[in-house]
């Protein structure tokens, strides 16, 4: 009895060590790169302002109700708590997502282990997940976007769904209802896209008739509707145009690309299939055909296999029918990882020799992908074409450059395809140093202006019209300059890094 207990302790200790090692790509040097464009940049400003105003219902941008990103503020609440603990830093914005991603790994492991009673199968699912760029890359596990929390909530919902299918206790209906409420407060209707696959799984597992005849399903549904409606009506009280913004920014018009607020270029229905194969799932996608072949060999679709297959494929098809961004398919990564892991388990149950033969290439791919993920985390850097997007952010992130800024400093960007990923840093400087820096245009320039820019086109244009004195410089074309008349003589000596 004692030896069995000691063996179990050692096995779980091994699992814990492996999980810590697998989590490294999710948190190593997570604060080195500046705040990223789009959702993270928007969320960072929302969180900074909420930490000041304590307006917990309405997300604001420049202290006005945010209508560009009208998602509820669950993630922002966590980021505000993180700011209170860690200050206005990149780590504060990203730490909640890192925690959610690590928790997702444990939920995924727990779900697969519950299905198989095999720890190594659960570890394979986690290995596939954390080494996929679609999980640890930008807009996902390491960054302050909504995807990390959404993935955790989807996995939590699926865990409760599976437990309910095995043991239809009413508490699981309320757990699933609570998760849906949190999911809506995280990223609007995104979590509801998992429901069609869940219904199909319950039908296949013959749990559907009992579900619809259970009054607690309707009580749980009512709970969801009341809590979600309470938030949306409460926010509408303070932001009267909020429901209009939600309709066009989050619901059907956005999905069908008929929104009056957002417009997306047309992308093929097969876009996500290509992205999974070429970018986010990469080598692991080679194993996906085997997940279809294995149940064919067994001449049986097990409930466990069908659980992952139907939830993953249904979500993929729904997402493929709507507007698209690379990071929208981040929740697909753990679902397909679970599908591959369960397929290996099914093969193991049929033939241990075949399963261990397949295990060898999995370990080879796993080592290769882990090395890539670990390297990306250990040496985070900008791509060559990103310096003209994040140059100002790097400049403002580094305290060594801040002493050269003044109330006369203005930011000048090119007149086309220019983004303001640096707004979080401007607000941080304003709060900490009382220094307000605004953006200007070419038409507003005056002799004596101090200009901060990161576009080569801007620097070249300034040199044509002014004598440009470089006070400070950073990566590539990021320069802090003073404009002088062409007739003036300056000492042009950049302080290059």
Task: Show which residues each predicted segment covers.
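Membrane-interface transmembrane helices that cradle and orient dolichyl/undecaprenyl
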Residues: 114-116, 155-173, 297, 344-347
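Short hydrophobic alpha-helices at membrane interfaces in multi-pass membrane enzymes
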Residues: 120, 160-181, 309-312
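Transmembrane-helix motifs of polytopic, lipid-linked glycan transferases
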Residues: 95-116, 156
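Extracytosolic helix-loop segments that constitute the early lumenal/periplasmic catalytic or substrate-binding loops
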Residues: 24-29, 43-67, 74-77, 81, ...
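Short periplasmic/luminal acceptor-recognition loop of GT-C membrane glycosyltransferases, typified by
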Residues: 368, 372-488, 493
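Transmembrane-helix signature of polytopic, membrane-embedded enzymes
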Residues: 12-17, 108-131
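Transmembrane-lumen/periplasm boundary regions of multi-pass, lipid-linked membrane glycan transferases
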Residues: 43-50, 182, 191-300, 312-322
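Hydrophobic/aromatic-rich transmembrane helices and adjacent perimembrane loops
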Residues: 323-349
């Amino acid at each position: 009895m004692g030896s069995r207990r000691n063996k179990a302790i050692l096995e779980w200790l091994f699992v814990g060590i492996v999980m810590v090692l697998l989590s490294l790509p999710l948190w190593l040097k997570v604060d080195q790169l500046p705040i990223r464009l789009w959702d993270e940049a928007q969320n960072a400003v929302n969180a900074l302002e909420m930490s000041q105003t304590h307006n917990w219902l309405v997300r604001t941008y420049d202290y006005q109700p945010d209508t560009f990103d009208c998602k509820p503020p669950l993630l922002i609440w966590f980021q505000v708590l993180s700011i209170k603990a860690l200050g206005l830093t990149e780590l504060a914005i990203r730490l909640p997502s890192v925690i959610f991603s690590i928790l997702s790994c444990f939920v995924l492991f727990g779900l697969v282990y519950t299905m198989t009673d095999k720890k190594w199968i659960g570890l394979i699912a986690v290995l596939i997940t954390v080494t996929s760029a679609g999980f640890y890359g930008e807009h996902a596990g390491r960054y302050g976007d909504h995807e990390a929390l959404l993935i955790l909530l989807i996995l939590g919902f699926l865990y409760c769904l599976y437990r309910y299918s095995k043991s239809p206790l009413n508490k699981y209906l309320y757990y699933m209802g609570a998760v849906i409420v949190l999911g809506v407060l995280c990223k609007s209707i995104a979590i509801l896209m998992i429901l069609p696959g869940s219904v199909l799984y319950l039908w296949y597992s013959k749990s559907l008739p009992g579900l619809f005849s259970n009054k607690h399903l309707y009580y749980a549904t009512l709970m969801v509707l009341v809590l979600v409606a309470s938030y949306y009506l409460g926010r509408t009280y303070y932001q009267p145009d909020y429901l209009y913004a939600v309709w066009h920014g989050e619901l059907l018009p956005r999905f069908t690309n008929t929104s009056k607020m957002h417009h997306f270029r047309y992308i093929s229905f097969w876009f996500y299939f290509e992205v999974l194969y070429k970018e986010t799932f990469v080598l692991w996608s080679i194993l996906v055909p085997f997940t279809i072949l294995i149940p064919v060999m067994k001449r049986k679709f097990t409930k466990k296999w069908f659980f992952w297959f139907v939830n993953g494929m249904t979500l993929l098809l729904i997402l493929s029918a709507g507007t698209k961004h690379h990071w929208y398919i981040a929740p697909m990564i753990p679902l397909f990882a679970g599908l591959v892991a369960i397929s290996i388990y099914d093969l193991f149950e049929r033939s241990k020799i075949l399963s261990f033969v397949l295990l060898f290439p999995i370990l080879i791919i796993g080592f290769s992908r882990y090395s890539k993920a670990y390297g990306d985390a250990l040496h985070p850097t900008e791509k060559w074409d990103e310096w003209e997007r994040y140059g100002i952010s790097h400049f403002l992130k580094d305290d060594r450059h801040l002493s050269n800024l003044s109330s006369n400093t203005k930011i000048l960007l090119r007149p086309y395809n220019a983004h303001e990923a640096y707004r979080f840093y401007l607000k941080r400087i304003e709060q900490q140093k009382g220094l307000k820096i605004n953006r200007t245009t070419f038409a507003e320039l005056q002799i004596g202006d101090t200009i901060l820019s990161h576009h080569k086109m801007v620097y070249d244009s300034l040199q044509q019209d002014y004598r440009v004195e470089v006070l400070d410089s950073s990566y590539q074309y990021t320069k802090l300059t003073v404009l002088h008349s062409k007739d003036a003589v300056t000492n042009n000596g950049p302080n290059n890094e």
